[in-house]
A protein has these predicted regions:
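Short, compositionally biased P/S/T/A/G/V-rich stretches that sit at domain boundaries
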Residues: 12-14, 19-51
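Active-site-proximal beta-strand elements of phosphoester/diester hydrolases
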Residues: 1-2, 27
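Short, small-residue-biased leader/transition segments that mark boundaries at the very start
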Residues: 3-8
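Long, low-complexity serine/threonine/glycine- and acidic-rich segments characteristic of extracellular
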Residues: 40-54, 58, 62-144
Length: 144
């Protein structure tokens, strides 16, 4: 059997908005508002990029931009990589013995981005711009 990828993205749906000849669409996570388009993880959360902050941008395509700021300074675009979503990996690691189907588990996803902060106590802001020009922002304060 093939392993079934577990991804936060599975808990949502696409929303399409039509205005005359213009079409806008976005991913809607169940239980979250429209602006919740990505998850941001602190340094150390990702087993693939332990030295980096990681963003999982669920509906990403090549027209999107993923920028980051450290202490208010524009650091440019984050680097895309393939890896495990930290929350899904941790969930599977802790709970796999209780799964009814043993082929369920964390799988590699290709909509992850990373950036390595210069200092351990930085304020990090990530700005994601989608294909329609909508900007989504998340902030976190790194701890020492």
């Amino acid at each position: 059997r093939r392993q079934r990828q577990m991804c936060i993205r599975d808990s949502g749906y696409a929303v399409y908005e039509f205005d005359g000849g213009k079409v806008n669409w976005y991913y809607k996570c169940v239980g979250k508002d429209k602006d919740y388009q990505f998850e941001l993880y602190p340094v150390g959360a990702s087993r693939n990029k332990k030295e980096a902050v990681v963003a999982n941008v669920w509906n990403y395509d090549s027209t999107w931009k993923v920028k980051w700021y450290e202490n208010g300074i524009d650091k440019g675009e984050m680097t895309r990589f393939s890896g495990y979503d930290p929350a899904i990996y941790e969930y599977c690691e802790k709970n796999s013995s209780t799964f009814k189907h043993k082929y369920l588990g964390a799988d590699i996803t290709e909509h992850l981005f990373y950036a390595v902060p210069e200092t351990k106590d930085s304020e990090i802001r990530v700005e994601v711009t989608d294909h329609c020009g909508n900007v989504y922002t998340r902030k976190m304060q790194q701890s020492k």
